């Protein structure tokens, strides 16, 4: 019996728990690494000249859409965007994109990984 118990403990110790991706401002859970899509990382410059290092996720349940969608100055051809904000503190985290499908482009410096 002792041997079986030992094996059970060894099995449990091998289980890796996935870390959540958090809002850097309030630590609200935004998404998880398993929702990352490829290509995952991009650097873009907006028309005002600001650069953003963006991480793409198929979903970000902790981020809400804010504002009207527009395809103006979209970084992804065929996609319209709206702002993505933290559901808890309303901090701007990036953008939601809608086109053939929907995904979130989140600003790396506004996340805690």
Language model features with spans:
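A short Gly-Trp-Pro
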Residues: 1-113
